Every structure is written in C-alpha cells, then in structure tokens.
A protein has these predicted regions:
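Conserved ABC ATPase "signature" C-loop
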Residues: 215-216, 231
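A short, surface-exposed alpha-helical micro-motif characterized by mixed small hydrophobic
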Residues: 203-205
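The feature captures the beta-strand-to-loop junction immediately N-terminal to the Walker
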Residues: 52-54
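H-loop/switch region of ABC-family ATPase nucleotide-binding domains
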Residues: 197-198
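Pre-NBD coupling/linker segments of ABC/ABC-like ATPases
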Residues: 1-34, 225-229, 233-236
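Conserved ABC ATPase "signature" region
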Residues: 14-21, 104, 116-133
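ABC ATPase "signature
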Residues: 221-222
C-alpha cells in the first residue's frame, strides 16, 4: 500500500487538513511512499492481534490504515464493523475551549452522535476526575490532565474493532489503576483487537495471534509464543 508523501508531514489536525488541500492542487508535484508492502492480512471475529517490530517497521502505519486515517493510493482495505481507535489521543482538541466543550469535539471526531456524547458526558467527567478544571480552557491543563481527559473520552465509546497503539500512561497511580482496568474491559469486550506494542510480555497475555513487521512487511504471523520467540531471536541477530 502507498500513500501521498505529504501525509507524513501532517502532525496536527490543521496541518493534515492543509496537506489534503495542497494534495488536491498539486498532485503532479507529489510522489507516493510505499509504506506497507506485499502482504494480505485477514482478521476474524474473536482474534486479538498483537503487532510487534522495531521502530519504523510499519506497525502504526498498519493501524492507521485500518482506521482510515491515511488515504490509500494503491491496495485495498475492507473493514466490516465499527472502529474504536485509541491513538493520537489529543487529536481534535481546541486549546481555547473548556474540557467540557472538548468532550463534544473529541466525541464527534470519534464518530459519536451528539445524543451519544450527551449520554456519556457525565461518565467521562467523573472518570477524568478534573474537578472544576473541566470548565477551564484546556490550554491551562498540565500534560497529565490533558491525557486523562483524552483517555476518558476515547475509552467511553465502543466499537466492534478496537485499534490500540501502546497502553496509555495517564497520570498518577490512582488514575493509572482505573485506566488499566478500563483497558482490560475494552480488550475483553472487543470482537476484534489490533494492538501495536513493544511489550512482548503483555502481547502474550492479551493476544491470541501476533504478527511481526519489518520494513513495511509482515515477516511472521502466528501464535504469540512462537512469534515473540522469533522476534527476540531476530533482535539479537548481528
């Protein structure tokens, strides 16, 4: 699968929007980047798939391809079911708006309806536990507070397919304990999970299938213990 080169330069929502506008006007000036190569991946209901590999191997690109974040120029993606993505947690936030207002913005970006967001708002506020800061502009938040709000919004919504890029670190020990419990509930409740991680111990605990990626290719696909052993051996090779 390949993508317009400009997509990799878009690190914020505003930049991504402008990159797409430039793409429409200057297609002849862009080249495509072949990020994922020579593979077919089929995931069935009930499969919790871990994705491992070195930095730059294509793990996160695969996840964002499934989510529809990257516009595919060549290749096809066929997804059946609703997607629940847990990555780029800060995407869609407006620094000048309050935490309460940003719950709406983030929820809409994740595909929730206004009615669904309204029904979940108090649960999100209680879980984030930001006190009176929920009505302050989020530009006044610490990084930990911002992550707590983002995590609370993102994990309050459900879908058939859970896409997860690492386990989120979300503040103090008390909140981390809540966050870990919620993550386990999401993992256990999802029909399909695709989990990108460097933690080989965790991937063996929560996944029933693991793939290893290298330079945009799937080089191993199978049982967690077998693929993790192959990965560790490959990492130790000269």
């Amino acid at each position: 699968m390949s993508y317009p080169a400009s997509i990799y330069n878009a690190t914020t929502l505003k930049q991504e929007i402008f990159s797409k506008l430039r793409l429409q006007k200057k297609k002849e000036l862009l080249r495509d980047v072949e990020a994922l190569k020579d593979y077919t991946l089929h995931i069935e209901n009930g499969e919790h798939v871990g994705v491992i590999g070195h930095n730059g191997s294509g793990k996160s690109t695969l996840l964002k391809t499934i989510a529809g974040v990257y516009p595919v120029v060549s290749g096809t993606v066929d997804v059946k079911g609703s997607i629940h993505s847990l990555f780029d947690l800060g995407l869609g936030f407006d620094l000048e708006s309050s935490g309460r207002e940003n719950i709406i913005y983030r929820g809409l970006l994740l595909g929730a309806t206004p009615a669904e967001i309204e029904a979940k708002s108090q649960e999100i506020i209680d879980f984030a536990d930001l006190g009176e800061f929920i009505d302050y502009p989020i530009k006044s938040y610490s990084s930990g507070m911002l992550v707590r709000l983002a995590f609370s919004v993102s994990t309050s919504l459900t879908g058939d397919i859970l896409l997860l890029d690492e386990v989120v670190g979300a503040g103090d020990a008390s909140f981390m304990a809540k966050a870990q419990r919620r993550m386990k509930e999401l993992m256990n409740g999802s029909k399909i999970m695709v989990f990108v991680t460097h933690n080989t111990t965790l991937v063996q605990q929560v996944c029933n299938r693991v793939i290893m990626m290298d330079h945009g290719r799937i080089v191993k696909d199978g049982k967690p213990d077998e693929v993790v052993a192959f990965y560790k051996k490959a990492m130790c090779a000269p």
